[in-house]
């Protein structure tokens, strides 16, 4: 008796072009939402989910796991639907925003292609702007839980890249100075900082946090940098915003827990969601 081997998920097959999978995902989104193209995309991390309701009219929702290349979210606090939202800008014009509701983390073991599939799908829908958000640990004791911080740069400590082959992308301004200036017009008090991504899923040790600080990091987390790299490769203009949900290990007097991250995100949710919606409408 012979058994049929399980089918290989497209992104796991080295012979598969990940950009073709992203194109298929974009086509599925267009058909499911009735929106031919999107102007911008948002990835809402821990604590940021409420921003979707404040952006504008939800045109359609698509279960994320039904879109080619995506799977259900593995982390509590992350959305499981992808939304197309009609956004009325401050100048009266209308844009369509794609809110990606399922972020894949590197620690899930699905590979780097899966981590950046949402970003490549956003680009395939026509998006020119990408807003990446996350919940993170803070090294600056002046930034208490609930503080939003604009990303000015990042340090990729995953030892991985989403790019394959001789793809040499300039990351000098990976986080758009223009978009950061726009965000400061919405809230001049927003601080800026450098974000360091660790692989996870375990939290950083106090020694690792000290190392990150010596390297120049102000924030530590487990997402965002690989997505930002892929976004720049696709030609997207990127804005990164972190929500400090806790002080990092060795700085915080208490042990870290994911429940703490979710609780801090929920407490800050209304304020940071309104901030993000205001920025997106610009």
Swiss-Prot record:
Pathway: Purine metabolism; purine nucleoside salvage. Keywords: Glycosyltransferase, Transferase. Its EC number is 2.4.2.1. A purine D-ribonucleoside binds at residues 204, 246. It is an enzyme of class 2 (transferase). InterPro entries: Nucleoside_phosphorylase_d (IPR000845), Nucleoside_phosphorylase_sf (IPR035994), PUNP (IPR011269), Purine_phosphorylase (IPR011268), Purine_phosphorylase-2_CS (IPR018099). Signal peptide: none annotated. The active site is at residue 204. GO terms for biological process: nucleoside metabolic process. Disulfide bonds: none annotated. One of its GO terms (molecular function) is purine-nucleoside phosphorylase activity. Phosphate binds at residues 46, 78, 103-105, 223. Pfam families: PNP_UDP_1. It catalyses: a purine 2'-deoxy-D-ribonucleoside + phosphate = a purine nucleobase + 2-deoxy-alpha-D-ribose 1-phosphate. PROSITE patterns: PNP_MTAP_2. The keyword Ion transport does not apply. GO terms for cellular component: cytoplasm. The purine nucleoside phosphorylases catalyze the phosphorolytic breakdown of the N-glycosidic bond in the beta-(deoxy)ribonucleoside molecules, with the formation of the corresponding free purine bases and pentose-1-phosphate. Cleaves guanosine, inosine, 2'-deoxyguanosine and 2'-deoxyinosine. Homotrimer. NCBIfam families: PNPH-PUNA-XAPA, PRK08202.1, PUNP. Belongs to the PNP/MTAP phosphorylase family. This is Purine nucleoside phosphorylase. It comes from Cellulomonas sp.
């Amino acid at each position: 008796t012979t058994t049929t081997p399980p089918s290989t998920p497209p992104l796991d097959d080295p012979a598969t072009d990940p950009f073709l999978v992203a194109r298929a995902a974009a086509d599925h989104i267009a058909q499911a939402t009735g929106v031919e193209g999107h102007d911008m995309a948002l990835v809402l991390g821990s604590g940021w989910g409420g921003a979707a309701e404040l952006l504008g009219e939800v045109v359609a929702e698509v279960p994320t796991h039904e879109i080619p290349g995506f799977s259900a979210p593995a982390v509590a606090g992350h959305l499981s639907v992808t939304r197309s939202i009609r956004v009325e800008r401050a100048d009266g014009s209308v844009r369509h925003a794609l809110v990606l509701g399922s972020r894949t983390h590197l620690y899930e073991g699905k590979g780097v292609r899966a981590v950046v599939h949402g970003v490549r799908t956003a680009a395939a829908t026509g998006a020119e702007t990408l807003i990446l958000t996350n919940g993170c640990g803070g090294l600056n004791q002046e930034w208490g839980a609930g503080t939003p911080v604009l990303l000015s740069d990042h340090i990729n400590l995953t030892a991985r890249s989403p790019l394959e082959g001789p793809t040499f992308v300039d990351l000098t301004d990976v986080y758009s100075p223009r978009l950061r200036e726009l965000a400061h017009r919405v809230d001049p008090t927003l601080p800026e900082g450098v974000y360091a991504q660790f692989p996870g899923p375990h939290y950083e040790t106090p020694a690792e946090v000290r190392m990150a600080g010596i390297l120049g990091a102000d924030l530590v987390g487990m997402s965002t940098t690989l997505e930002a790299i892929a976004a720049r490769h696709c030609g997207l203009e990127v804005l990164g915003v972190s929500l400090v949900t806790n002080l990092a290990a060795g700085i915080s007097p208490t042990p870290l827990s994911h429940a703490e991250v979710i609780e801090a995100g929920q407490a800050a949710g209304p304020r940071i969601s309104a901030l993000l919606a205001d920025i997106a409408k610009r």
